[in-house]
């Protein structure tokens, strides 16, 4: 979980564009971010496993 101060810091408008950091919309995690979904890999796995993301299925071959 991201700290409250880190989340508040990222909400403020940044002076430079390179300082912007993508964060998970659900938990605020800065790493393992999937742009297509806007969430981190851990939250993506949880939601996909529960069938809450349309079109995402467990692979099997």
Swiss-Prot record:
<dbReference type="InterPro" id="IPR001209">
    <property type="entry name" value="Ribosomal_uS14"/>
</dbReference>
<keyword id="KW-0694">RNA-binding</keyword>
<feature type="binding site">
    <location>
        <position position="43"/>
    </location>
    <ligand>
        <name>Zn(2+)</name>
    </ligand>
</feature>
<comment type="subunit">
    <text>Part of the 30S ribosomal subunit. Contacts proteins S3 and S10.</text>
</comment>
<dbReference type="InterPro" id="IPR018271">
    <property type="entry name" value="Ribosomal_uS14_CS"/>
</dbReference>
<keyword id="KW-0862">Zinc</keyword>
<feature type="binding site">
    <location>
        <position position="27"/>
    </location>
    <ligand>
        <name>Zn(2+)</name>
    </ligand>
</feature>
<keyword id="KW-0687">Ribonucleoprotein</keyword>
<dbReference type="Pfam" id="PF00253">
    <property type="entry name" value="Ribosomal_S14"/>
</dbReference>
<keyword id="KW-0689">Ribosomal protein</keyword>
<protein>
    <recommendedName>
        <fullName>Small ribosomal subunit protein uS14</fullName>
    </recommendedName>
</protein>
<keyword id="KW-0479">Metal-binding</keyword>
<dbReference type="GO" id="GO:0015935">
    <property type="term" value="C:small ribosomal subunit"/>
</dbReference>
<dbReference type="GO" id="GO:0006412">
    <property type="term" value="P:translation"/>
</dbReference>
<dbReference type="GO" id="GO:0019843">
    <property type="term" value="F:rRNA binding"/>
</dbReference>
<feature type="binding site">
    <location>
        <position position="24"/>
    </location>
    <ligand>
        <name>Zn(2+)</name>
    </ligand>
</feature>
<keyword id="KW-0699">rRNA-binding</keyword>
<dbReference type="GO" id="GO:0008270">
    <property type="term" value="F:zinc ion binding"/>
</dbReference>
<dbReference type="GO" id="GO:0005737">
    <property type="term" value="C:cytoplasm"/>
</dbReference>
<dbReference type="InterPro" id="IPR043140">
    <property type="entry name" value="Ribosomal_uS14_sf"/>
</dbReference>
<comment type="function">
    <text>Binds 16S rRNA, required for the assembly of 30S particles and may also be responsible for determining the conformation of the 16S rRNA at the A site.</text>
</comment>
<comment type="similarity">
    <text>Belongs to the universal ribosomal protein uS14 family. Zinc-binding uS14 subfamily.</text>
</comment>
<dbReference type="GO" id="GO:0003735">
    <property type="term" value="F:structural constituent of ribosome"/>
</dbReference>
<feature type="binding site">
    <location>
        <position position="40"/>
    </location>
    <ligand>
        <name>Zn(2+)</name>
    </ligand>
</feature>
<dbReference type="InterPro" id="IPR023053">
    <property type="entry name" value="Ribosomal_uS14_bact"/>
</dbReference>
